[in-house]
Design a protein with these regions (language model features):
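The alpha/beta-hydrolase serine catalytic core
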Residues: 67-176
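Nucleotide-sugar donor-binding loop of glycosyltransferases
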Residues: 18, 51, 128
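Short, well-ordered alpha-helices that flank and scaffold nucleotide-derived cofactor binding pockets
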Residues: 3, 7, 59-63, 140-143, ...
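Active-site catalytic motif of lipid deacylating hydrolases and related acyltransferases
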Residues: 1-41
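Gly/Ala-rich beta-loop-alpha elbow adjacent to hydrolase catalytic centers
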Residues: 48-57, 61
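Short active-site-adjacent helix-start/loop capping segments
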Residues: 23-25, 55-57, 77-79
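Short beta-strand immediately N-terminal to the catalytic nucleophile in serine-hydrolase-like folds
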Residues: 44-49, 69
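A general structural motif
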Residues: 11, 42-44, 65, 119-121
């Protein structure tokens, strides 16, 4: 998506930072960044996230009222990540290590919005073939959102390019 944005919409700010392991710090940093832009998030911001990033996108949308797209979003990350306390590697670069602390579990619990809101401003792309997360939980959590339920695929959404058009369409993005 970053390549498409750079090539077709360089007029739009594309921000895809490496987030810190602390969920509270990650969300606070993202909120600070958005506040620094001086925009109306409900009108001028869209957030896209996958897996834990989908959880963060849901948190940001609940706080800012912006449009958002989630791809195989983590629904209960506090529960699901509890077994990963300790040293981990990043998905993007297995040579990069970080430490996931037990203290991050209550941070995730505190961040979880009670409901997905604004649900009508959400697109959820959910793969039934997700090998890490239960697609039925995702489907139930994002009830009322625009949902694209995929037969097969996987957690990483390896066929992402096939769905880019749906994401761009939902966000009303066309080539400039």
């Amino acid at each position: 998506m970053g390549r498409w944005m750079a090539e077709h919409r360089p007029d739009i700010v594309w921000h895809c930072p490496q987030l810190p392991p602390s969920p509270a710090e990650a969300v606070a940093g993202l909120l600070d960044t958005v506040a620094g832009w001086g925009i109306d998030p409900a009108a001028d911001l869209a957030v896209v996230g996958s897996s834990l990033g989908g959880f963060y996108a849901t948190v940001l949308a609940a706080r800012l009222g912006c449009r958002f797209v989630v791809i195989n979003p983590a629904v209960e990350p506090a529960r699901d990540l509890e077994k990963y306390i300790g040293e981990q590697t990043t998905w993007q670069d297995p040579s990069e290590h970080f430490y996931f602390k037990a203290a991050f579990i209550p941070e995730l619990q505190a961040l979880r919005p009670a409901v997905v809101s604004p649900v009508q401003r959400a697109l959820a792309i959910i793969a039934q073939g997700d090998e890490l997360l239960d697609w039925r939980e995702m489907f139930a959590r994002y009830e009322g959102a625009h949902i694209k339920l995929l037969e097969g695929s996987d957690h990483a959404l390896s066929d992402f390019d096939e769905h880019l058009g749906d994401i761009l369409g939902f966000l009303e993005l066309t080539a400039a």
